[in-house]
Swiss-Prot record:
Annotated compartments: Cytoplasm
Subunit organization: Binds ribosomal protein uS19.
Limits of the PRC barrel domain: 104-176
Protein source organism: Mycobacterium leprae (strain TN)
Coiled coil start-end: none
Record protein name field: Ribosome maturation factor RimM
GO cellular component labels: cytoplasm; ribosome
Length: 179
């Protein structure tokens, strides 16, 4: 489990490929706030994920929507070769740099991942492996002994989230936990 308040690196985008000849990169968005993360003047930390190179920093010149992705121009990346060299790189931020959430019962994904899941009757179900975002809402992918179970993250099922205790307590409908 992640220690409450522990520093984690969170990926906010991944460079998919170069775009055009002017140095733009196509970025797969992995943040719920791309407008503020990729706003002009922001400094992005880039991890050279596929090649294991050193972390580099880039200043955003501009970003614009490109379907479900962004086209991003970075200072110092002025041609296709320089942009293509970034392919596969991950833009990351530190979890402690995230603004606090003021809404009750709202969490960042990384806060839920690693929490123990149990029923209201005390039966251990497993550990939250991932939070999935679907058109129908959020699902907790819970890793358990018999595989994985998807638990809708809704008040009718998720009765308690305690970050301090590291638990998610659920009241599953009949059949939800049957694999």
């Amino acid at each position: 489990m992640h220690a409450h308040g522990a520093l984690l690196e969170l990926t906010i985008g991944r460079v998919v490929k170069a775009h055009g000849i002017g140095g733009e990169v196509v970025v797969e968005i992995r943040t719920d706030d791309p407008a503020s993360r990729f706003c002009p003047g922001n400094i992005l930390r880039a991890k050279d994920f596929p090649r294991g190179g050193p972390e580099r920093r880039y200043t955003v010149v501009y970003a614009r929507e490109h379907g479900a992705r962004l086209l991003v121009r970075l200072a110092g990346v002025s041609d296709r070769d320089a942009a293509d060299a970034l392919r596969g790189s991950l833009f990351v931020i530190d979890s402690l740099d995230l603004p606090p959430i003021d809404e009750p019962d709202t969490y960042y994904d990384h806060q839920l991942e690693g929490l123990q899941v149990r029923t209201m009757m005390g039966r251990d179900v497993g550990v939250v492996a991932e939070v999935l975002h679907t058109a129908a809402g959020e699902l907790l992918a819970v890793r358990c002994d018999s595989g994985e179970v998807l638990v809708p993250f809704v008040g009718a099922i998720v009765k308690l989230v305690s970050l301090d205790d590291g638990i998610v307590e659920i009241d599953p409908p009949k059949g939800l936990l049957d694999l």
